[in-house]
Swiss-Prot record:
<feature type="binding site">
    <location>
        <begin position="203"/>
        <end position="204"/>
    </location>
    <ligand>
        <name>1-deoxy-D-xylulose 5-phosphate</name>
    </ligand>
</feature>
<dbReference type="GO" id="GO:0005737">
    <property type="term" value="C:cytoplasm"/>
</dbReference>
<dbReference type="InterPro" id="IPR008867">
    <property type="entry name" value="ThiG"/>
</dbReference>
<comment type="pathway">
    <text>Cofactor biosynthesis; thiamine diphosphate biosynthesis.</text>
</comment>
<comment type="subunit">
    <text>Homotetramer. Forms heterodimers with either ThiH or ThiS.</text>
</comment>
<keyword id="KW-0963">Cytoplasm</keyword>
<keyword id="KW-0784">Thiamine biosynthesis</keyword>
<feature type="active site" description="Schiff-base intermediate with DXP">
    <location>
        <position position="116"/>
    </location>
</feature>
<protein>
    <recommendedName>
        <fullName>Thiazole synthase</fullName>
        <ecNumber>2.8.1.10</ecNumber>
    </recommendedName>
</protein>
<dbReference type="GO" id="GO:0009229">
    <property type="term" value="P:thiamine diphosphate biosynthetic process"/>
</dbReference>
<keyword id="KW-0808">Transferase</keyword>
<keyword id="KW-0704">Schiff base</keyword>
<dbReference type="InterPro" id="IPR013785">
    <property type="entry name" value="Aldolase_TIM"/>
</dbReference>
<dbReference type="GO" id="GO:1990107">
    <property type="term" value="F:thiazole synthase activity"/>
</dbReference>
<comment type="similarity">
    <text>Belongs to the ThiG family.</text>
</comment>
<dbReference type="Pfam" id="PF05690">
    <property type="entry name" value="ThiG"/>
</dbReference>
<feature type="binding site">
    <location>
        <begin position="225"/>
        <end position="226"/>
    </location>
    <ligand>
        <name>1-deoxy-D-xylulose 5-phosphate</name>
    </ligand>
</feature>
Amino acid sequence: MVSAPPAEQLIEDAPLTIAGRQFRSRLMTGTGKYRSIADLQASVAASGCEIVTVAVRRVQTNAPGHEGLVDALDWSKLWLLPNTAGCQTAEEAIRVARLGREMAKLLGQEDNNFVKLEVIPDPKYLLPDPFGTLAAAEQLVKEGFAVLPYINADPLLAKRLEEVGCVTVMPLASPIGSGQGLRNAANIQIIIEQASVPVVVDAGIGTPSEAAAAMELGADALLINTAIAEAGNAPAMAKAMALATTAGRLAYLAGRIPVKAYASASSPLSGTITARS
């Protein structure tokens, strides 16, 4: 039996590049909502991810579920993506981003200027504030941050954030932690078509099939947290999401068949056997 070659040998694909830094994995993961530190560690390993996001405010305040979180992971093998979760205004997000940069330095990542920018004043649906996000992004870019903004699937906002210097845009598939899946596919498709920076679909992905579908649209990467952390078996789901991310990317690069309104036989009709009259 001949074994199948690795995906990277089937079709040429460049690494994910964000702010000049290259990553092999196109799946990013979070650190919240895990049942235990052991579950977190096993899930990060199973996912094969290289970028892990951490909520700076919750780590700074030792919020429940975040005690010892930073020390639990090997940051010599992972790239820290500090995030400004919990910030309701641009001013708060800017202050927390600065703390996140200092956190990265303390973990040995002296050149890490990445920040996942979240400005979320809405406590029920956790939808990001476009005005606060844009204002914070403009200031953080001036301060030398590599800004990865979390946004609604708004093509105009995505383009504007790119113009002010953000290194990615991160449109939501559906509300954070909702597991509703890819509810904004049409707008995300437009964002992907217009963007010249990586598009990372973030929030709302609930299953591997939804992860694959997002990648099939042409997304450059995914950030998935709740669907992994709250799964019945978090490490197994992490592995499933990693496989789905790879499958979706490979399918996108391979090119799907066009959708038709009629059938098309997979076998030629010539040479078929017919009954005698």
